[in-house]
């Protein structure tokens, strides 16, 4: 087999890169001139964020994993993550209610105080997506929900490991049932049900505040069901993008319209005490283009 030499590859890349750069530049210019792409607004303060430098992440993947027809713990993965800018605190009740007043958001169900130091709760995935659009329009920056991978990266040592620790080669489903029962019983025994002011649950090593307290956080990651072979390698995968992963003391899949998790909508396990969210500031160069095309942060 003959492989192209390095000079030919460089020439081919150059011939593609220049037109691509011109198209991107022209698209951006047209977008800003036409108002399709957001420019920096002056309608309100930008939320406080933390910046996490690029680094390694080891976490247990989200989803439901099966081998030989039996549920097993999700595999752990090690990846390199790019730097991340994410809200230090969860979105406040006051800020969300301001979005409601300005017509950008749907009124929340829970009658908690509209305070600047109290996280908003009683909001669905759809509500969070509407708020992200409103904040992006208001600030001229792109804000979106984090993926579960991004939230795990930000949460660092506070991110939960939901493994049951059962021997993956065990063919006795009763062992997993008993371990799952003990875990869910322990989760239900340690409840502080009402939202607490900012800072009540401390900060992690990255400066992220209150993660893993009594508020689970929406992510943009869909629930997936993965079938593994005998070597724990994926052989098939199915996503359900009407159900999204929330994370807090443990991970919990919730339907996108659920506002009150204790009232139903959790696929498995103990329901979260409360559900809220925080956003990532998306600084990818193409984020404004995605925003303009889709009409929402992606």
Outline where the language-model segments fall.
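Short capping motifs at secondary-structure boundaries
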Residues: 84, 91, 97-108, 135-141, ...
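A short glycine-rich, aromatic-capped structural motif
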Residues: 40-107, 126, 213
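Disulfide-stabilized, aromatic/cysteine-rich ligand-recognition loop
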Residues: 2-36, 203, 238-298
């Amino acid at each position: 087999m003959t492989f192209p030499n390095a000079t030919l590859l460089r020439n081919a890349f150059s011939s593609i890169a220049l037109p691509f750069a011109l198209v991107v530049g022209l698209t951006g210019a047209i977008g800003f001139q036409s108002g399709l792409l957001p420019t920096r607004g002056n309608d309100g303060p930008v939320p406080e964020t933390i910046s996490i430098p690029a680094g390694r992440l080891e976490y247990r993947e989200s989803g439901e994993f099966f081998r030989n027809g039996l549920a097993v713990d999700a595999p752990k993965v090690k990846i390199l993550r790019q730097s991340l800018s994410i809200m230090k605190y969860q979105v406040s009740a006051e800020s969300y209610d301001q979005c409601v007043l300005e017509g950008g958001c749907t009124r929340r169900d829970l009658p908690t105080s509209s305070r600047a130091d109290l996280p908003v709760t009683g909001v669905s995935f759809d509500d969070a997506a509407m708020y992200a659009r409103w904040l992006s329009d208001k600030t001229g920056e792109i804000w979106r929900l984090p993926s579960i991978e991004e939230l795990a990266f930000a949460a660092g040592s506070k991110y939960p490991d939901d493994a049951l620790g059962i021997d993956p080669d065990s063919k006795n489903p009763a062992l997993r049932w008993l371990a799952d029962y003990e875990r869910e019983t322990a989760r239900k025994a340690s409840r502080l049900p009402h939202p607490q002011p900012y800072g009540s649950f401390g900060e992690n090593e990255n400066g992220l505040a209150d993660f893993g307290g009594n508020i689970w956080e929406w992510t943009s990651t869909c629930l997936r069901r993965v079938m593994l072979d005998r070597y724990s390698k994926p052989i098939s995968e199915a996503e359900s993008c009407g159900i999204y992963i929330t994370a807090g003391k443990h991970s919990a899949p919730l339907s996108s319209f659920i506002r009150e998790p204790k009232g139903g909508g959790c696929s498995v396990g103990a329901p979260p005490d409360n559900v809220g969210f925080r956003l990532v500031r998306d600084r990818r160069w193409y984020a404004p283009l995605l925003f303009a095309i889709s009409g929402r942060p992606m």
